[in-house]
Every structure is written in C-alpha cells, then in structure tokens.
Amino acid sequence: MREILHIQGGQCGNQIGSKFWEVVCDEHGIDPTGRYVGTSDLQLERVNVYYNEASCGRFVPRAVLMDLEPGTMDSVRTGPYGQIFRPDNFVFGQSGAGNNWAKGHYTEGAELIDSVLDVVRKEAENCDCLQGFQVCHSLGGGTGSGMGTLLISKIREEYPDRMMLTFSVFPSPKVSDTVVEPYNATLSVHQLVENADECMVLDNEALYDICFRTLKLTTPSFGDLNHLISATMSGVTCCLRFPGQLNSDLRKLAVNLIPFPRLHFFMVGFAPLTSRGSQMYRPLTVPELTQQMWDSKNMMCAADPRHGRYLTASAMFRGKMSTKEVDEQMINVQNKNSSYFVEWIPNNVKSSVCDIPPRGLSMASTFIGNSTSIQEMFRRVSEQFTAMFRRKAFLHWYTGEGMDEMEFTEAESNMNDLVSEYQQYQDATADEEGEYEEEEELEQE
C-alpha cells in the first residue's frame, strides 16, 4: 500500500508530531500499547499507510523521532502514546542546537544525521510502495530548521522520486521565541524551496488567534495549538487512510496545487472550529463547512488570502455527504469570489471526499490553498532578516560554526525572488498571457 514515513525533528516538531499520532491512533482505534481496540473494519483496511504491523499483532507507527537534545524525546516517551513508538526510532544527541541553524545543519546535526538516515532507510525498506515522507518541524529554532532541512536534502538525494511533504511552523510576527528566528527561517526557506515538494505553512500567532477568537480559549497552551495542527494533518491524509468517493494522495495533491515548481507553500485551514462547549448545538451542513473553511480567520498562518489571489486550492471533505453538493458549493465559492482566483487557471479548486469523519464530528473539511498572499509572510521574515543582517548582528554564532556570509546573502535573495514570483503571478492576467503567445508566433515566422 501507499505508505507514508513520518519524521519529526526538534522540540516543536516532536510536540506537534506526538499530538498527531494521538489523533491518528484514535481514528484507527489503536490504543497506547499499539493494540487494535476499534469497532470498524474500515479502521484497519489501510492502517498500513502509517503503521507497521509487528509479529505480535501490535501496530507500530512508521515514525522517526530526532532531536539534538534528549529533553523533548523524554517527554514524548513518557507521554500518553510514548510506548507505541519503536524504541530504536528515537535518535537524539546530547549537545542541543541552541537555536542555531548552523549547528543543526553543519556541525551537531551533521554528526547525528547518519544515524537518522539509517533509521529512515530501515523504515523505508519495510514499505511495500513508499509514497513519500512527511516532516514536522519549526523554522525558527536550530534543530527542526537546520537539521530538518539537512535531512530533507539527504532524503531527496536518496529517494528523488518520492513525495516530500513538510509541516513547517514559521516564526510568528508578534510572538518571537528567539531573536535569531529570521536568520533560521530564511536559511530554511532557502532549502525548502529547492528540496521539498509541498510545504504546509503554520504559524503560532495565527493558531493563537483561532484558539482565542473562534474557540474562545482565554489562555491557549501549545497543546491546544498542536491539536489544531494535528486535525489538519490528519485531514490532509485521510483520503489515503480511509475509503472515499473522490480520493487523493500526496502526488495528486501536488499535481493539482503546484502550477510552478517553486511556489509550493500552502496555507491550511480546518472546519468546523467551534468552542468545545458549543459543539453540540450546531448542525453541520456542507455550505456551513465551506463558508468557514474559506474564511480568512480560519487560516493557520499569518497571511490574509484577501490580499492576494488563489492560484489553486484543494478541499478535503470528511463524512457522509453528497458529492454533488460539495461540487456545487465549491463552484459557488469560485463564482461569487472570482476576483480572488487567477483567471488563467480555470477550475483551479479541487475537492475530495472521504467517508469517515474525525472522531466526534459528523462531517469536517480540510482546506489547502496556494495563495499569492503567502508572500506577506516571507516578506515579513525577510524584512526582519535584512534589518539584522545589514548590521551583521548575531552573525558570529553562525560563522563560528563554519558558515560563510555568502550563504546568508544567497538565502536572502532566494527568498526575495520567491516573493517577487508570487507577486508576478498575482498581477498576471489572462490577456497578458495571450499577448505573449501572439508575439512568439510572429517571431517564429
């Protein structure tokens, strides 16, 4: 079957990742010891996308956990589902990356990377037909960003034809953990543009806003934020794990969402988001889901889709519903808001339907959009980067690990190129495209 190998790195990646496994285990009826306690055959039908079945009948996640310090790993191991992972798949160093991308990418991380790759190979050999990899990491720290991108480039070399999907937590605009986030994030984006196929962009601030505004939580914890992320992660892959009327996989997703190879950074959303108390009082309908899903307040990264245009988008519905109604709603959205979609990609919204809803809901939907407005986020990080780099602030931490200033300059210009590419396609109109073609024809004559 089409397996996906899950890799989580750094503190953020491990925390998101372990939350994700709680959700997926719950959906497939697998208890914290790896035994199946579910009620429906559908839970087991494609359980091998994310799990190996051990000889004793236990299910073991296809997960590789890495970090440069033991702390977060220990808390995963002692957490609710800590005993389900294969002990050999915990790979950790002792030194820590200290929020330094260079340590994660060149020094400390480079020493540990071979042992991580060994585990990845072992897991990949266990697969029948490996579809791809999903990596959870943050771009602001040292391990997830530096070592995460190192691992992605190594896997790219070894498995060039497999999909590489990342769930990347970007530094948020107002809430900053460390002062060097803009450096780490820019260096990481430089890598992700080249080596990843699809990046789901998340950011803490947008997640805080959702918890605060929509879920009415007064003091959201990281656990609450990660719960939102895990709902989305589970939604992205539900088509692979459960039967559906309109299935999609990572490759189909990429083909439908990526018009130009470098523009593969997506905003994600999830519906229904209602506060825990009010869930039971609201009926769920396809139009309601659709409306909430396209709402800019629902996006899990700090960019406003109303400031740009959608190149493409994909909606994954879960639950028993009529596909006709789904299609009608999607067409409706496009017709009503046609100015927010580029007109030179007709039918640029794809939908898929999976029959099994998430636990506790009758229907749900996951939204993935490729919008030019995501440049706001890159632009913001880039401005912060330039402000510090112009003064060469904090650079010695990076050059001390053997990095060259040249690399910073390259990463900066790559990110600025990305921003202007998004801008170029945001401004492009169908008539312009037509004019080019005519000119070319004349030249050929």
UniProtKB/Swiss-Prot annotation:
Its main location: cytoplasm. It comes from Triticum aestivum. Belongs to the tubulin family. This is Tubulin beta-1 chain. GTP binds at Q11, E69, S138, G142, T143, G144, N204, N226. Residues 429-445 have a biased composition (Acidic residues). The lineage of its organism: Eukaryota, Viridiplantae, Streptophyta, Embryophyta, Tracheophyta. The keyword NAD does not apply. Dimer of alpha and beta chains. A typical microtubule is a hollow water-filled tube with an outer diameter of 25 nm and an inner diameter of 15 nM. Alpha-beta heterodimers associate head-to-tail to form protofilaments running lengthwise along the microtubule wall with the beta-tubulin subunit facing the microtubule plus end conferring a structural polarity. Microtubules usually have 13 protofilaments but different protofilament numbers can be found in some organisms and specialized cells. GO terms for molecular function: GTP binding; GTPase activity; metal ion binding; structural constituent of cytoskeleton. GO terms for cellular component: cytoplasm; microtubule. InterPro entries: Beta-tubulin_BS, Beta_tubulin, Tub_FtsZ_C, Tubulin, Tubulin/FtsZ-like_C, Tubulin/FtsZ_2-layer-sand-dom, Tubulin/FtsZ_GTPase_sf, Tubulin_C. It is found in: Cytoplasm, Cytoskeleton. GO terms for biological process: microtubule cytoskeleton organization; mitotic cell cycle. Tubulin is the major constituent of microtubules, a cylinder consisting of laterally associated linear protofilaments composed of alpha- and beta-tubulin heterodimers. Microtubules grow by the addition of GTP-tubulin dimers to the microtubule end, where a stabilizing cap forms. Below the cap, tubulin dimers are in GDP-bound state, owing to GTPase activity of alpha-tubulin. The keyword Acetylation does not apply. Its cofactor is Mg(2+).
